[in-house]
Amino acid sequence: MSESRIDFRKAEFLISAPDIAHLNEYLPGDVGVEIAFAGRSNAGKSSALNLLTEQKIARTSKTPGRTQLINVFKLDKHRRLVDLPGYGFAQVPLALKLKWQQALGEYLLKRDCLSGVVVLMDIRHPLKDLDMQMIEWAVESHIPVLALLTKADKLGQSDRMKMVNEVRKKLSNFDDAVKVEPFSSLKGIGKSKVLSILDGWCKPEWLMQQIEADAIAAAQAEAGKE
């Protein structure tokens, strides 16, 4: 069964939750497909979500660490985007910082419907310890990762590709589990490439088969009414 490209502009706010335990209370079970966005508090995560959905769906802040909640956005009845709390911020109490990092780890390791994780990193300062931890958690759970090097407009074309290649080399031990792409919310660099990757993550074979089966069942039920 074929399906047209997912329209990420249709994303709409669903719920907010302080941690994965509360998230499970609100979501309709661990079902469907979720794509998570994670990154350091200054990596430009909210700006990236706003560009990809072409709306101000995620709140941006000049204060690192302000986004403390897990925010969930619905694409359709089968698919969701999940904006995870920023990590690595300095002006936050250690206990709260550790609590958030634990919640991120639990989400990545326990959420079966996760179809992909976008780890956003400032292209000028990639692969910090917590970035690597996020990537390793996802790979450990057999979840594909897109390492998105944000603020790519801050570098010239030559330096930009040099950094992309360096990061790809450092992550090469993960084989095909991790893709690396440059991105700029300001200039739109990498937008179409990212949307293509996300579109693929939204269409795992099992979900496409389920959608087809549901369509057939609905058609048969409708025919039975005639």
Swiss-Prot record:
Pfam families in alphabetical order: MMR_HSR1
UniProt record, GO biological process: division septum assembly
InterPro entries linked to this entry: G_ENGB_dom, GTP-bd, GTP-bd_ribosome_bio_YsxC, P-loop_NTPase
GO cellular component: cytosol
GO molecular function: GTP binding; metal ion binding
The keyword Ribonucleoprotein appears for this protein: no
CDD domains (UniProt xref): YihA_EngB
Cofactor list: Mg(2+)
Protein keywords: Cell cycle, Cell division, GTP-binding, Magnesium, Metal-binding, Nucleotide-binding, Septation
Domain EngB-type G: 31-204
Binding positions for Mg(2+) per the UniProt entry: 46, 67
Transmembrane spans: none
Binding-site residues for GTP, renumbered to this chain: 39-46, 65-69, 83-86, 150-153, 183-185
Family membership noted in the UniProt record: Belongs to the TRAFAC class TrmE-Era-EngA-EngB-Septin-like GTPase superfamily. EngB GTPase family.
Function: Necessary for normal cell division and for the maintenance of normal septation.
NCBIfam families named in the record: GTPase_YsxC (TIGR03598)
Protein name: Probable GTP-binding protein EngB
Species name: Shewanella halifaxensis (strain HAW-EB4)
Lineage of the organism: Bacteria, Pseudomonadati, Pseudomonadota, Gammaproteobacteria, Alteromonadales
Gene name of the record: engB
